[in-house]
C-alpha cells in the first residue's frame, strides 16, 4: 500500500473544495496515508477573455493537470466531471465517480425574481451554450451575456450590477455556501444539466493499480451508471463546451432513465428525447443506452443542428 498520495487540482475556490473533500474522504478510509495537494494552473484559468465556445479546445480545465498525471508528478487528479472530455488521454482513466450533488441549474437574480418574471430583455449571464439554447427557447427576449471566472468573481460582477440575473450549477453554489443567493432552482423539465454535472471525476493512471484500488473506494455506483450513460451519449454526438447538449440520467433498482436535449444556439430548434432501460447489471449497459439515445437524436435531426453549429463556432 502506498504511504503518500499527491492530488492535482486547479486553484479556484470550487476546485480546492473538491480536492479537499476528496482528501478528507480518502483520509477517513486510509488514515495512514500522507495526502498533499498540488495546484495546477490550466488553460481555462488563464484564457478568461473569450467565451468557452470560441476557444474551441477540449479539456481546457483538465489537460494541464493530466500532463502532471502522465509524468507522475501527481497520483490522481480531481475534476468537475462536466469539465472532463469524454475521451481521456492514453494511459489515463476516470477511476471513481463520486456521489452526485443536486444536478439542477439555478437562477441568481435581483430581488429573487424568477426566470418567467424577469423583465423584458433582461441581461442574463451564462458561459454555457447549453443554457443559452434552453433559455432562449423559453425566453427569446433575453439578452444573453457571456461570463467567465470563478464563482466568487461571478457573484462580484453580478453584485456590481453588470447583469440582471445569472445561471449557475446548484452544486457549485451549494458547495461554496452561496445557497442563500438562489432565486430559483430550475427543474429538469425546464433546463437539462450538463453531462456529469454535480459529480466529481477522479482520474488516475491506468497502470497505477495501487492508487486505483485506493481511489475506487470513493466510487458511487449509481452515479457511475448515470454519468457513463450521459458521457456515452455526448461522446457519440461528438459534443463538448461548444455544443448545446443537455442530459440527465437516473438509475434505481436496475432501471436507467436518460433524458437528453440538443438545440440550436438561438433556441429556435430544440430536440428532446429519452430512453428507459431495465435490468441493467453493468455500467457498460448504461453506456449502450446512452449511445442508443444518441442515435435516436441523430435520426431526429441532431446531426444537422450540430453540423451547423460547428461551422459557425
Curated annotation (Swiss-Prot):
Residue positions, PTM S-(dipyrrolylmethanemethyl)cysteine: 241
Cofactors that this protein relies on: dipyrromethane
A Pfam family matched in the record: Porphobil_deamC
Pathway(s) this gene product operates in, as recorded in its UniProt entry: Porphyrin-containing compound metabolism; protoporphyrin-IX biosynthesis; coproporphyrinogen-III from 5-aminolevulinate: step 2/4; Porphyrin-containing compound metabolism; chlorophyll biosynthesis
Binding note for cofactor: Binds 1 dipyrromethane group covalently.
Catalytic activity: 4 porphobilinogen + H2O = hydroxymethylbilane + 4 NH4(+)
Entry's EC annotation: 2.5.1.61
Enzyme class: transferase
Domain of life assignment: Bacteria
GO terms of biological process kind: chlorophyll biosynthetic process; protoporphyrinogen IX biosynthetic process
Gene Ontology CC annotation, any one: cytoplasm
Xref: SUPFAM superfamilies: Periplasmic binding protein-like II, Porphobilinogen deaminase (hydroxymethylbilane synthase), C-terminal domain
GO function terms (MF aspect): hydroxymethylbilane synthase activity
Keyword Transferase attributed: yes
Oligomer and partners: Monomer.
Family annotation (HAMAP family): Porphobil_deam
Extra facts: The porphobilinogen subunits are added to the dipyrromethane group.
Function as written in the Swiss-Prot or TrEMBL entry: Tetrapolymerization of the monopyrrole PBG into the hydroxymethylbilane pre-uroporphyrinogen in several discrete steps.
NCBIfam families per UniProt: hemC
Family indicated by similarity: Belongs to the HMBS family.
Identification of the protein by name: Porphobilinogen deaminase
Organism: Pelodictyon phaeoclathratiforme (strain DSM 5477 / BU-1)
Lineage, broadest ranks: Bacteria, Pseudomonadati, Chlorobiota, Chlorobiia, Chlorobiales
Gene this protein is translated from: hemC
